[in-house]
């Protein structure tokens, strides 16, 4: 596992949970994840769940993605999706507002791998170099991804060659993220 990425992700998650605690006096709250089972849930309201990150349980890799395309996925991406279970976290990187994606449970981890495979299928069909998403943005056509060739974190417009490098590594990107509440 890419330890620098794992450490940077845990550090950002601590910053996010700490900022939430400071602002709201509780663990993060999510309406979107209400009713979806997870080891992260610590309590529920009528229509939301309070959550805290939990250690990832299971095989710590995204080998299903590698097998589907006979490729080697950047080690940072393995670490990103298998360090912890947590809720998605809104954040800001420089001027870019985003939602950092996380796996909520083992079932969600399987779904994320299926979505990554679908993303790669589309890229292959359009003859684009492979990227693997890690965050969404308000504009549904823009995502934050890892370039699987270079390991750089990029902002890309889906279905196009339009890509902007944001950071040289995922660990660097995560270190510079700020929680957005």
UniProtKB/Swiss-Prot annotation:
Recorded topology in the membrane: Peripheral membrane protein
Protein name as it appears in the record: Protein Syd
Family membership noted in the UniProt record: Belongs to the Syd family.
UniProt-annotated location(s): Cell inner membrane
Entry keyword annotation includes Metal-binding: no
Keyword Cell membrane appears in the UniProt entry: yes
UniProt cross-references to Pfam families, sorted A to Z: Syd (PF07348)
One GO term describing the cellular component: cytoplasmic side of plasma membrane
Keywords tagged on the record: Cell inner membrane, Cell membrane, Membrane
InterPro entries according to UniProt: Syd, Syd_sf
Primary role: Interacts with the SecY protein in vivo. May bind preferentially to an uncomplexed state of SecY, thus functioning either as a chelating agent for excess SecY in the cell or as a regulatory factor that negatively controls the translocase function.
């Amino acid at each position: 596992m890419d330890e620098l990425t794992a450490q940077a992700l845990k550090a950002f998650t601590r910053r996010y949970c700490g900022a939430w605690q400071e602002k709201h006096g509780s663990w993060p709250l999510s309406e979107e994840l209400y009713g979806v089972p997870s080891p992260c849930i610590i309590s529920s309201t009528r229509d939301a769940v309070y959550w805290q990150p939990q250690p990832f349980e299971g095989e710590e890799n995204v080998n299903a993605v590698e097998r589907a395309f006979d490729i080697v996925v950047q080690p940072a991406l393995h670490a990103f999706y298998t360090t912890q279970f947590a809720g998605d976290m809104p954040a800001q990187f420089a001027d870019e507002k985003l939602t950092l994606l996380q796996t909520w449970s083992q079932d969600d981890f399987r779904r994320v791998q299926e979505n990554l495979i679908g993303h790669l299928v589309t890229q292959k069909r359009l003859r684009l170099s492979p990227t693997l998403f890690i965050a969404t943005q308000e504009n549904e056509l823009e995502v934050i991804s890892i370039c699987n060739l270079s390991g750089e974190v990029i902002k890309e417009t889906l279905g196009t060659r339009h890509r902007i490098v944001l950071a040289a590594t995922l660990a660097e990107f995560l270190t510079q993220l700020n929680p957005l509440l």
